[in-house]
Amino acid sequence: DMAAECKLARETGYLAYKTKGRPWFDIHEQLRQSCAVVPEAFKIDMDFNDTLLDAERALPILRELEKHPQVDIYETPIPQSDIAGNRLIREHTRVAIAMHYRKPPPSIQVREGICDGFVIGGGASALMRSGAFAAEASMPFWLQVTGSAITAAWSLHFGGVLSHAIWPAVDCHQLFKEQLLTQPIV
């Protein structure tokens, strides 16, 4: 239940929550319930994994969801290869659009104005290269490096040195029963 997860996230100190926008859930009702239990300052990011198919179908849904002030980022609402469609979505929503780094190439993403920032993951060298490009392009991003609390601690170091890693990070360490650290990440 998304509302319970948002409430728990806020109670444990998180300022944002990332969820999957999926057609088998009533996303409008889930969002309504979630926004009722968290303040406007708490942000909800929605990852559609291109399930909204194209801009014509996506925009009515996205425009309705953006009425909730908590909605802050849409990740990949339609296929990233649809440059014209993504540009249209970006131009017609107040919500930031995030795209996975490298598809299409980030220079095209920036030049064509199809996103507001990136989802960046990978190993140490890739993170540093991608983060440097994002800084040069003045594009924010979130680090998406998932694993145990050890991985989360490793990712936190990159978040501390990459100037544009300012969107909420995704590391998923909370899903592990054993954290593998002697002191928890707070």
Whereabouts are the PLM-identified features?
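Shared catalytic-loop signature of beta/alpha-barrel
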Residues: 63, 70-73, 81-96, 101-186
